Amino acid sequence: MPFQKIVDEFALGSVNHSPAFFDIVKMQSFNAEYIRAMTVDEFIAACEVWLTGERAPWKQANYDAKVFAEIAPLVQTRVQLLQDVPSMVDFLFCEMPAIDEASYVKAFAADWAASTLIAIREGFKNCDWKADSLKAVVEKIGEQNSLKLGKLQAPLRVAVTGRSVGPPLFEPIELLGRDATIKRIDAVLAKKVS
């Protein structure tokens, strides 16, 4: 909200007499609303300081502004603070994502996790490299194994991003590319074997 609008709408009579406190959760909620109200171009510009320079958790040579511009609309709806953006997209700009151990253990606890991830890997080798086609491969494997898409996404997400939460999965996989995706799946499967 613009400062002048705040000044115009302030009324001393509306001030509550009870002790004031700073509500961080409410502030973050307001901030998230402000972020979602930005245009995508404004959001990209606001994120630049967090994505370039010393604050970024990747080598600057690995950062691609065009790739971020592609994923920005998906990230914009999921962050409350701009400082959270790098952790949502780091897997796109790091050679290999750090695997969150708790996410890994949870995603691979089921006996079907590794075998279905192998099947997904094989399906990804020859499919059209578009988000819809990638999703269709995973859905087909889910049908063959009587598993819903959400369950199958967990091991795949951990393999690709290193954690269990993030932006929608298939658009970032498309951006990451076939070779990098398969390399990450292989790495997490090797971890599973060891």
Question: Which residues make up each language-model segment?
Answer:
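Small-residue-rich helix-loop
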Residues: 40-145
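Structural motif
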Residues: 17-23, 61-70, 143-151, 164
